Structures are given as structure tokens and as C-alpha cells.
Amino acid sequence: MGFILFEILSLALLVALFSATGRLVEWAVSRGHSAFQPAFVTRQALGMAVWVAAAFCLAASGLLARWLVFVLAGVMVLAYLVAAVRGRAALEMPSRRDVGLEGLGTAIAASSMGLLLWALFLQTIWPAVGWDANVYHLTVPRLWAEAGGFRPIAFNVYSNWPLNTELLFLVASLLRDYVLAKLIHYWLGVLTLIAVFWIVRRSAGALYGWFAAALVLCNQIVLAEFRVAYVDLAFGFFFFAAFLLLQAALERERRGPRDLIVVGLLSGVMAGI
């Protein structure tokens, strides 16, 4: 039980770190403008993008170390707290309406989805890895961490260039271990479901939003990949997040370069998955 609680806490802290980092980027990009929607999904994506870039810079310069990653995390959190105190980057707490708990039907649908995601969470934290993860998705970041940066890996054709998702796995491995890296891929799947729920709820209602999210999980490939440290759910998440932001930008009567900066950023992250 202690192991499960610790993994929940580890993932929650990592999610909070991504949110704080993403909120800082959002404030810098959209200063004086309304927040990008869906806000939570966008901030998670932006936070991940920043940490992908940070991991790449550290590894490329040979400065990759656990203590330095913790220092950077502390700096990000401190910068966010300063911005929040000044009223520039406060995080809004979701309401019952945001998660679609307005009636009995939606509450039952949300509870069912929660139970399924809980079961997938328990399977994800099981200390076992998939074939591809064992060959390169987790092994390559582990070798980078041991070497303090990028290094040639003989006979491994998948290590010729760092994938963005593997850089996220690298950050998670340095902050905790490979189980947290597996949970990142799980969390990317959850974020995709949140994005699907958000767009459908906005046009058809909360109950249909939960139904749409459930339909995504009916795909056996998606269901299987929740539990392993692969990269496919990351590709789907960043693609869909960029699409939602592009759609929102096109719906505005007045559009400017700021509206497309985040779209381009997330598309770039997706291209490097």
C-alpha cells in the first residue's frame, strides 16, 4: 500500500511541476490576453515542452545530473510562486461543472471512468516493462543518465537521435525511477481523454463527453499502451492539443501571432516524439 501511495504522490508532484512550468510559459506568451483553452491540458503540454528542452540542453552539454534536475525543478516552482503572489500566474481550481458532475448520469459515467483509470494505474506501476521500452524507450534514457549526457550506444539503431518522449522519461527517471517514467505515458493518455471530454462537453454536454472518452479507451491499442512506456500516446496527445488550440484560434474574430505560437510549439514537440 505504501508503494502505491508513493507512486500517486510522485505522479501528483510531477503533474504539479508541469502545471507550474506551463503556467509560466502561458503567462509569458499570452500576457494581456485570455488563457489558452483547455487551460489545464495546455499548461501540461507547455510544461512538458519546457522540460523536454531542459533535458536536451543538459544532456547535450554533458551536465545531466540528478541534483541539477532537482535544482531546476525548484527554480521553476519558486518562479511560479513569485508570479502567483504577484497575481500573474495563479492556477484556477476546477469546479464540479468543469469535470461534468452535474447529474446522476454524469456522476455514474465519471465514476466508471475513474475506476477504469485506477485499474490501469495499478497495472502501470507494476515493476515490469514492455519489449520496446526494455530495448530503447527506457534503456536509452537510463544510459544517458549514467553517462551524464548523450553518448553513442552500439548496436542500438533507435538511439541515433533523442525522442522528445524519451527525454521526458529521462527527467522522470532522474527525479524518481523508471516506474515514474511509465506513469508519464499513462498520464499522457489521461490528458488525451481530458481533451476529448472537454471538446465534446463544450458542444454536446458532459454525459456525451464522458461517452466520447470511453470510446477512445475502446481502442485496444490505446488501452494497451496506457500501461507501458512507449511514445504513441504522446504523439496523439500533442497532436490533439495542437489541433484544439488551432481550432480555438481560427474561431476568434481577432487573431494575432500569439494565438499560433503555442500551436507551433506543440506541433514541434509532436514532430520530435
Regions found by a protein language model. Give the residues of each.
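Membrane-embedded, hydrophobic transmembrane alpha-helices
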Residues: M1-D98
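Juxtamembrane segments of multi-pass membrane glycosylation machinery
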Residues: G2-F3, S34-A35, S61-L64, E146-A147, ...
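Transmembrane-helix signature of polytopic, membrane-embedded enzymes
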Residues: S34-R43, V179-L180, V196-C218, F237
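Transmembrane-helix motifs of polytopic, lipid-linked glycan transferases
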Residues: V77-V85, L180-S203, A241
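Transmembrane signal-anchor helices characteristic of membrane glycosylation enzymes that use polyprenol
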Residues: Y80-A83, A107-W131, C218
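Membrane-embedded glycan-lipid processing machinery
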Residues: I153, V157, W161, L168-S173, ...
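Membrane-interface transmembrane helices that cradle and orient dolichyl/undecaprenyl
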Residues: W198, A242-L260
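Membrane-interface alpha helices of multi-pass inner-membrane proteins
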Residues: A212-A213, D259-I273
